[in-house]
Amino acid sequence: MPREVITIQCGQCGNQIGEVFWNRLCTEHGINPDGTLRPEAYTFNDRKDVFFYQSDDEHYVPRAILLDTEPGVISHIRNGPIKELINPENVYIDSTGGGAGNIWTKGFQCGEAGFEKIVEIIDREADGADSLAGFSLTHSIAGGTGSGMGSFLLDRLSDRYPKALLQTYSVFPNTTADIIVQPYNSILTLQRLALCADAVVVLDNTALDRIITNHIPNELLTNPFEHVNSLVSTVMAASTSTLRLPGFMSNDLLSLVSSLVPTPRLHFLMSSYTPITSSSLNVKEHTKDQEAGSGAVAGAAAGATRRQVHTDSIVQLVKRLLHPTNGMVSCGRDGKYISLLNIVQGEAESNQLYKSLQQIKEGRDVKFIDWGPSNMQMALSKRSPFTNEAHKVSGLMLANHTAIRKIFDNINNTFTQLFSKRAYLQNYIDSMVTGGEPEILEQFTDAQAVCTSLSKEYEAAESKDYLEYIGM
């Protein structure tokens, strides 16, 4: 029986990623933009029900909830390619429609103000699941809505659905602040991710921007945000492929998370993907007329194609996944792996995976913790027959690695620089319903303590005495 996953898209970033994600899932499952099934998809042995349900008229509807504090992005989705796909009853926009102004407390308060309506949507969607596995939240931690309302949801969902897994795809900000108060928003959200979530896939904007720059020539770099959203949706689709297109391993959310998270606090995951292609980055194809009118663009497109990775070797695929340049987090690989899962899609055999696993383990490319087993797993997922891929195999790595603490340290350091001056606090104070300045100062202090503790725990995980450190 499929174990269903409900996707909650929160804020501008979360909804933009979600739109591309559903487009991709529809393609992989042979679902048309209006929710009907392509004739050739009726015989395809997959698990659509994990992420979709069938309405009374047999149209497929995403198990998706769209939340925002202003109408812009959701209005775009309602008028876009998947406008007939989304259930309009699963959309909530704050009644004021004014947005959160990049202030975490405003986003949180909007969540509280709309709690009854939001929880009604969530409960209705959960009641429609036969065997709910959990929730998947897409959001950014830097702005106001994805961070503030996202934090509110993390608080409430962990209390209301204690048996359901709470997993997130969380976009972390660039090291150089795009939003001047993003250190405040980030540390308050990181606290909730540490305390409430069961697994967090960290998607670091610095690394995402680097990948986009390295793989798309300037002439074809039309909209960086679209390319980033496409890359993130590729990671999301690949990470859920074993749930939707199952093989023998990690075919439900619980087994996927439990294979990667050995202790409750160590649940922040890195990801890598290869090969990076034009489809995974949403690089538009050029017609012959366009190429004739612009030789430079045509040449750039050819160059982009030449840089794509084509390999049949599973070992080489995994080695590429292990290389930091293919990672979605910009923290290097100094430290140790706690656990590692490689999901391979395409024309591969189980014995190839086993042999490559043994070969990688025998090499010196991967350093594992000393207090547990060398937890490196391989999962084979079949590929959708409805996608046209130039390469025979593709791979996604989900890894629990101690180097992730560098991301936490960076957030902590930038927060300290801003907070030590008490800079830009007034907007946070003004949007507090109760408590005012004393309460927001206490929240910041508590959040920083959690962030510091989280970094120290990942550092301790590099030691053979880690289990003693956590009292086991």
Curated annotation (Swiss-Prot):
Q: In the UniProt record, does the keyword Glycoprotein occur?
A: no
Localization, UniProt = Cytoplasm, Cytoskeleton, Flagellum axoneme; Cytoplasm, Cytoskeleton, Flagellum basal body; Cytoplasm, Cytoskeleton; Cytoplasm, Cytoskeleton, Spindle
List, in alphabetical order, the GO biological process terms annotated in this UniProt record. Answer: axoneme assembly; cytoplasmic microtubule organization; meiotic spindle organization; microtubule nucleation; mitotic cell cycle; mitotic cleavage furrow formation; mitotic cytokinetic process; mitotic sister chromatid segregation
Q: Which UniProt keywords apply?
A: Cell projection, Cilium, Cytoplasm, Cytoskeleton, Flagellum, GTP-binding, Microtubule, Nucleotide-binding
Listed SUPFAM superfamilies: Tubulin C-terminal domain-like, Tubulin nucleotide-binding domain-like
Checking SMART domains in the record gives: Tubulin, Tubulin_C
Q: What happens when the gene is disrupted?
A: Knockdown of expression by morpholino results in an arrest of cytokinesis, leading to reduced growth rate and increased number of cells with four nuclei. Knockdown has various defects including increased number of disorganized cells impertinent for cytokinesis and increased number of cells without furrow. However, knockdown does not have an effect on the number of cells defective in cytokinesis or abscission.
Residues binding GTP are 142-148
Name the residues that span the membrane: none
Q: Which GO terms describe its cellular component?
A: 9+2 motile cilium; axoneme; centrosome; ciliary basal body; cytoplasm; gamma-tubulin ring complex; gamma-tubulin small complex; left posteriolateral flagellum
What's its job?
Answer: Tubulin is the major constituent of microtubules (Potential). The gamma chain is found at microtubule organizing centers (MTOC) such as the centrosome. Component of the gamma-tubulin small complex (gamma-TuSC) involved in microtubule nucleation for the formation of median bodies and in the biogenesis of flagella. Gamma-TuSC may be required for the correct positioning of EB1 within the trophozoites.
How the protein assembles, per its UniProt entry?
Component of the gamma-tubulin small complex (gamma-TuSC) composed of tubulin gamma chain, gamma-tubulin complex protein 2 (GCP2) and gamma-tubulin complex protein 3 (GCP3). Interacts with GCP2 and GCP3. Interacts with EB1.
Q: Give the family, as the similarity comment puts it.
A: Belongs to the tubulin family.
Tell me the protein's name: Tubulin gamma chain
Organism equals: Giardia intestinalis (strain ATCC 50803 / WB clone C6)
